[in-house]
A protein has these predicted regions:
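Short alpha-helical donor nucleotide-sugar binding micro-motif in glycosyltransferases
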Residues: 282-283, 290-295
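A conserved nucleotide-sugar
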Residues: 116, 225-228, 234-279, 286-287, ...
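Conserved acidic donor-binding segment of nucleotide-sugar-dependent glycosyltransferases
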Residues: 341-342, 346-353, 362-368
Length: 403
């Protein structure tokens, strides 16, 4: 759904989106929320270009009516900085600071050149740090207005590094519009900037499937979906599994990859869990929907990690709720924006395997309660996280910026 009045005002406007992530194919999940937002806004008549980093020398191309300009910033083998979490890679391997520096410098030059040639009407900057550094020359010298979208990570960096906070305090007031993916992220912005911030959550990027019932003799499935890094708290879910297995046979399905994958597999071996855990890696959207449809409980055990980073929103919970699945999660970051405790899911303390196990066992022992949470979650997602609502919010932000 689009607003006809706002559609008229966006007709023919060229919006250039600067993002570290964008799917390489329509079926890709890496940056799927950026792609889905753009596709949903195309009926407004606006033209979109995406400026995103190359992944191992990937070329620029046009996909679904959107030109994706892939900028080169390093040798092919090192062009994977933004895959699986740049902050974690920088923390674990300081030498990654070299491609990170080149990313900003070469990205700035190429973005300015692209803006000089294309003259967009608006720059939509995802993650204002570091992308605000890259967008600023084009915005200031060419007079292009900006909308800035914060996702949480850049603001948690600001808490840790004074120079990031100083930059954002100076940079945020330059924008014609600022958005946050959750009230948690909005709160972090408000510590640096006292102007208006529009909360616009992510919407569903996969098509929900009907529930797939268990086959005779099949044990209940617990599902986790996400990047395998510290802030996702998967190690605590693995520690909870022996407690669950002592009372109930289950199978854990883990979708996603990340820098901690080998450590987590080693933890599985130490706990003797190899036979009941499946590491599925990256999957297609069709396969992901299949996993949601066939699971009994979805668990997101996120934590505030050692860097102070945590969950900005948690789109995977929205996907699980869209499949009417009961969710067990932790009350960190933007998760409470999605889960209403004891109505659409269960929230337990972070870093607490016993609490995770207790919540999962409660749902498996009470299928009627689990089904009720799933139904409530589906209804809530259809209301608060519908694309109709989300796109109207984006239209208002963009129209105000280009007016």
């Amino acid at each position: 759904m689009v607003n006809d009045l706002e559609t008229t005002k966006l007709q023919g406007k060229h919006i250039l989106v600067l993002s570290s992530v964008y799917p390489l194919t329509p079926d890709g999940n890496h940056g799927a929320f950026v792609r889905e937002t753009i596709l949903r806004l195309q009926p407004t008549g606006a033209k979109f270009t995406v400026f995103a980093p190359a992944y191992e020398a990937s070329k620029s191309y046009t996909l679904e009516g959107v030109h994706i300009y892939r900028f080169r910033y390093c040798l092919k083998r090192f062009e994977n900085l933004v895959r699986d979490g740049a902050p974690t890679k920088l923390q674990r391997q300081p030498l990654n600071l070299i491609p990170a520096t080149l990313y900003v410098i070469l990205g700035t030059v190429q973005l300015f050149w692209l803006c000089l040639r294309k003259r967009p009407d608006l720059l939509h900057v995802q993650w204002p740090f570091p992308h605000g550094v890259m967008a600023m020359p084009a915005a200031k010298l060419l007079g292009i207005p900006m909308v800035l979208s914060c996702h949480g990570g850049e603001l948690l960096l600001a808490k840790k590094f004074g120079f990031v906070a100083s930059f954002l305090r100076w940079f945020l007031p330059m924008a014609k519009g600022i958005t946050a993916n959750s009230s948690f992220t909005q709160g972090l912005i408000n510590k640096l900037y006292d102007g208006p911030v529009e909360v616009i959550p992510y919407g569903l990027t996969i098509e929900a499937k009907p529930a797939i019932p268990r086959q005779e003799g099949e044990v209940p499935k617990i599902l986790f979906v996400g990047r395998l890094d510290e802030r996702k708290g998967v190690r605590y879910l693995l520690e909870a599994l022996p407690i669950i297995l002592a009372k109930q046979p289950v199978r854990l399905r883990i979708v996603g990859k990340g820098i901690l994958e080998e450590e987590l597999k080693a933890q599985c071996q130490e706990l003797g869990l190899e036979s009941v855990i499946d590491f599925l890696g990256f999957v297609t959207k069709e396969e992901l929907a299949q996993e949601y449809a066939s699971c009994d409980v979805f668990v997101l055990p996120s934590i505030v990690d050692s860097k102070g980073d945590t969950e900005g929103l948690g789109i995977v919970m929205i996907e699980a709720l869209a499949h009417a699945k009961p969710v067990v999660a932790t009350p960190v970051g933007g998760i409470p924006d999605v889960i209403i405790p004891d109505q659409t899911g269960l929230l337990v303390p972070e870093k607490n395997p016993n609490a995770l196990a207790k919540a999962v066992l409660e749902l498996l022992a009470n299928p009627e309660r689990a089904a009720e949470l799933g139904r409530n979650g589906l209804s809530d997602v259809q209301s608060r996280f519908s694309w109709e609502r989300i796109i109207l919010l984006w239209q208002k932000v963009f129209v105000k910026a280009v007016d």
